[in-house]
């Protein structure tokens, strides 16, 4: 096993410090840092960026040849951490805990260590590791807000108010595919320069928002909407099938058969994991694809309607305007002027 002790402070020093302990170089561009895992420890990449609002976005994608343990120690900053598991699993505990807590694929952890308390993350050898990690400097985040923190919901206030690290926080979140989708958008984004910096900042806030929605829902009395991990995988099969077959979708029973779940379970799963019905999800994906097709400019509106699997141009215009505030024709005109 390899152990790395990282001191978390006000500067962007997590990746530089990790690079120093790994004995590798790191890259830096417009505040975004990255390093490659050395071959003696496996393969992969660590990247991260901190923003003026106190939100830091870090992504680890690796296949370690040895078990890896990160020890995160707080300095003058007492951060709040949101850690999402994209692949396989990782383990977490505070230094004085006897047992490790396992965070599975599509789950997340909301945590904060107390003063001088060490938080540990453990990644298995010979397993695909993919996590997205938000590090929130709670003091900076409060200063960035245009309103008083005390005005927000009580349970969320308790997460962000403790800038001195008086209380330990450890909340394991239920499964979410919506967060996974946002992270995958980050991973597939190929923009560079200042547009990339702004894109990453917006996506970091989107991930934070999704995690807070889940945390708020789980904090409600009597909240018991829990899916089995196997069902989460089947819902992912269903959503991937929808994404890849928008032009030929038939109905919900067809999607249910593909996923291997009954229609009631499919609907329940989409509500929990995407906060949408199946039909709402399909409509959203069609509208997202419509923007892409219309922007490319090599299809007319009737061709786009067919490629989206719709039969009515008037219905398409209606839902497009409801979503974007203008008709497809107006969108095309504005895009070409």
Descriptions of predicted regions:
Residues 265-266, 270, 315-316, 320:
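Short hydrophobic/aromatic patch on the recognition helix
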Residues 200, 242, 266:
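Conserved hydrophobic/aromatic pocket- or pore-lining residues that grip, position, or stack substrates
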